[in-house]
From Swiss-Prot:
This is Protein FAM98A. Transmembrane segments: none annotated. Positively stimulates PRMT1-induced protein arginine methylation. Involved in skeletal homeostasis. Positively regulates lysosome peripheral distribution and ruffled border formation in osteoclasts. GO terms for biological process: lysosome localization; positive regulation of cell population proliferation; positive regulation of gene expression; positive regulation of ruffle assembly; protein methylation; tRNA splicing, via endonucleolytic cleavage and ligation. It comes from the Eukaryota. GO terms for cellular component: cytoplasm; nucleus; tRNA-splicing ligase complex. It comes from Homo sapiens (Human). Residues 505-518 have a biased composition (Polar residues). InterPro entries: FAM98. Belongs to the FAM98 family.
Amino acid sequence: MECDLMETDILESLEDLGYKGPLLEDGALSQAVSAGASSPEFTKLCAWLVSELRVLCKLEENVQATNSPSEAEEFQLEVSGLLGEMNCPYLSLTSGDVTKRLLIQKNCLLLLTYLISELEAARMLCVNAPPKKAQEGGGSEVFQELKGICIALGMSKPPANITMFQFFSGIEKKLKETLAKVPPNHVGKPLLKKPMGPAHWEKIEAINQAIANEYEVRRKLLIKRLDVTVQSFGWSDRAKSQTEKLAKVYQPKRSVLSPKTTISVAHLLAARQDLSKILRTSSGSIREKTACAINKVLMGRVPDRGGRPNEIEPPPPEMPPWQKRQDGPQQQTGGRGGGRGGYEHSSYGGRGGHEQGGGRGGRGGYDHGGRGGGRGNKHQGGWTDGGSGGGGGYQDGGYRDSGFQPGGYHGGHSSGGYQGGGYGGFQTSSSYTGSGYQGGGYQQDNRYQDGGHHGDRGGGRGGRGGRGGRGGRAGQGGGWGGRGSQNYHQGGQFEQHFQHGGYQYNHSGFGQGRHYTS
């Protein structure tokens, strides 16, 4: 695994350094390092790396490539001398038997890694500290360009004592002779006609370099995408058996692709006016050569996925809109519960339910003559003398389903209480202290002593507090069933028991002088 990783790194580095040899092919490097110094291809690669190093570094030692395995020992001796001069830090390459060091695959890979890293470092240093430019006319780049012009035009080698003016005059004369042999518009008119000075050429060079850097990044990206795509083709089991064939077809074409651009300022000078023509890519003449069968395949109808802002509906509200509360169905003789219920045999009766109570008063939970709950009905004819008149819903023990009828009751009513044609009336608060009730105003052991009826109090606190629910009416005495129960004797005497804080009060016949009549 370690050797495979080293081989991959070496191949990538060789491509970056500009190596164009046969070891870039798939599997070639692995085969060469396995043979080591006995492989001529391995020795050629080492010789190329050393030659590139000698251009940038002052090295005395040199390495020559071999042509046969018999020259392996001589090659290893040369490599040993070179590594000693370069102060190689790897002991496996500088110690041990000289004739056997480079016969091991790992040592061969280590040697290539070391030479490649040294060459990369030397080139970096060369870029950061470029050497002085050679004088014009020597072996510089300018001299090479002028030499190429003379060869292209078929000119003979100029004499050594010729001046630059004479030299360029000879080139101009030769160009005119060559252009006279072709049609007038064969070359075309130049695209750049404006004369340029030194400052202009410097700016043009800077612009060209910026564009070259940008397109170099783009070309590297496209080449990397190509490598990854081709590599993905070999993932399938069927393609793994065709790896060698794929490499033979792909590697030659891949090696031609270079991230470096070949466009220079010379191309700007050579540009002609025909390059300024704008051709529509959709024109008929162009599409004749660029059209393919896939362009004729029409895509089927695609459903509209929406998403337009003007078509999006607002989301539903988090809370439903408030609506007016609708009243429930009206019952036949329903209404509000009478008081807070009644008492049956000295029991406390809830809030009183609806049980066909009259008017707005419920039945209140009474036992034949007990107090009616709430605001019971007032039946026509008012209260009866000596009957067990409940909370407006009984007459002589019978129930009359009558509403609130005019005519009132015999004793009428005032803001204080009701006079039932006899006695009772409104009991003032001065007659007793402590309000006469405990925790809700009900009296225990109340008995209607006249007829044996259990006239237990209905509507503990009356309807909703206040005046005892405005509905506590009971007994022939016509007294107000307010807060706290009261026992009535038909003869007009009261025997009441109020329990409040543990105290008991016994009153007989009090409050007889206050009557309310209609």
